[in-house]
Amino acid sequence: MKNKEVIVNNYLNLENTYIKLPKKLFSEQNPSEVKSAKLEVFNESLASDLGLSEEFLQSDDGVAFFAGNKILEGTVPIAQAYAGHQFGHFTMLGDGRAILIGELKSQNGERFDIQLKGAGRTPYSRGGDGKATLGPMLREYIISEGMYGLGIPTTRSLAVVSTGEDVMREEILQGAVLTRIAKSHIRVGTFQFVSNWGTVEELKALADYTLNRHFKKAEYEGNPYIYLLNEVIKSQAKLISKWQLVGFIHGVMNTDNVTISGETIDYGPCAFMDVYDPDTVFSSIDIKGRYAYGNQPKIGAWNLARFAETLLPLLDKNLEVAVEIAQNSISKYSDLYNKYWYTGMRAKLGIFNEEEEDKKLIQSLLTIMKRFKSDYTNTFRNLTLGNLSDIDVFTSEEFKTWYELWKERLTRQDQSSEESNKLMKKNNPTVIPRNYRVEEALVAAVKDNDYCVMQRLLDVLKDPYDYSNMNEYYSTLPKSTSCAYKTYCGT
């Protein structure tokens, strides 16, 4: 491994506990040097939350750190090994262009990974160049910060630097490196890698590390690995329900993109739904619609079943008993997901208490929205505002009938109409990272070196539930339908 210029570490107290795991789980790998690093965007709010020195990170040494040109004294950068089912097909993977620089502890004691994405080739690059380009890195920055604003667990972006290098794709593009912050980068695919190419002892080491890092309560449970499985099932059910509630379509729900921490990761072909349609797909490579909006909950169950399979040797020494335990845990996913999703949908309609008829009320509204090609976000936004004029869906007889049933439903709870409206405002965003507004910001930044458009969008996305300061510009719909919008795995 080539030696790197070292920054005497007076600013960040980084360590790397992951290297205490079996060696086959990672490869020591320094980032590649880049030609001319320039800090394009820096997340001051995130840096402050993490207790990091903004002065250092924006200095020449800080920019060199973000680019991978210099490493901090005492750190051991690594690329992580993992496998995964990609569109249902199992394969060996690993960090092909991402390098874990180290871990830091925030001011409240939480541990976070610092990873450089686009930092050069690794032993897992599989013929790739290990590089990333500016547009997709800025896109991940925008979407991940938008998700954070929406209250959805997510990896975050600390900075994007341009590299001054050309990167060859279908055309020549500007190179870039993104600094990603995550509670960890342990994936379902990490467990699949050890399950297929490791020993039971190595699997146990990974599971114990994961428990210690994310689920310390497991120290007090009977079988901690059953607890681990159940907690991951719970966190994924909750995460995917949150995606569905805001119309987020991940686009590439492969098992290597399922984090054990329950954070959203990998924003390559993701997008937000405009017109409500469960069959909505944006990813250019998802030809059969495997990861369509309406399929995401059941794909979540499929991915979790793959995770459960990896844990079988730890669930019980008797394989039949272990399988029964795993099946019992996985069988709870559907009810968990439905509980989280229906609770969220009730909140979007200002409903506090639960009634069995609520499910029919919710599904009826979605059916009407689909029929009239209603915008998902703005339908709930306008319901919240009571703005029901001049929109086809609201003037239809079907909606008027539904509306009376909804209003009658609201009378069957103790809370006032004002309290119901407050609940709706907390759960129905006025803005989302609309696909065409994101593209608008990227074009200005990448082609014109104008980051003002991106910054204005980021400012709006910081508080998408703020009804006191709505920006109509970011709520307007694209002139053409969202069906024409396609995303690519650039990140």
Swiss-Prot record:
Physiological role: Nucleotidyltransferase involved in the post-translational modification of proteins. It can catalyze the addition of adenosine monophosphate (AMP) or uridine monophosphate (UMP) to a protein, resulting in modifications known as AMPylation and UMPylation.
EC number: 2.7.7.-, 2.7.7.108
Active-site residues from the entry: 256
Keywords: ATP-binding, Magnesium, Manganese, Metal-binding, Nucleotide-binding, Nucleotidyltransferase, Transferase
Binding positions for ATP per the UniProt entry: 94, 96-97, 117, 129-130, 180, 187, 266
Cofactor(s) named in the record: Mg(2+); Mn(2+)
Reaction it catalyzes: L-seryl-[protein] + ATP = 3-O-(5'-adenylyl)-L-seryl-[protein] + diphosphate; L-threonyl-[protein] + ATP = 3-O-(5'-adenylyl)-L-threonyl-[protein] + diphosphate; L-tyrosyl-[protein] + ATP = O-(5'-adenylyl)-L-tyrosyl-[protein] + diphosphate; L-histidyl-[protein] + UTP = N(tele)-(5'-uridylyl)-L-histidyl-[protein] + diphosphate
Highest rank taxon of the organism: Bacteria
Residues annotated for Mg(2+) binding in this entry: 257, 266
NCBIfam families noted in UniProt: PRK00029.1
Family indicated by similarity: Belongs to the SELO family.
One Gene Ontology term of the molecular function aspect: ATP binding
Name listed for the protein in its UniProt record: Protein nucleotidyltransferase YdiU
Matching HAMAP family: YdiU_SelO (MF_00692)
Classification via InterPro entries: SelO (IPR003846)
Pfam families the UniProt entry points to: SelO
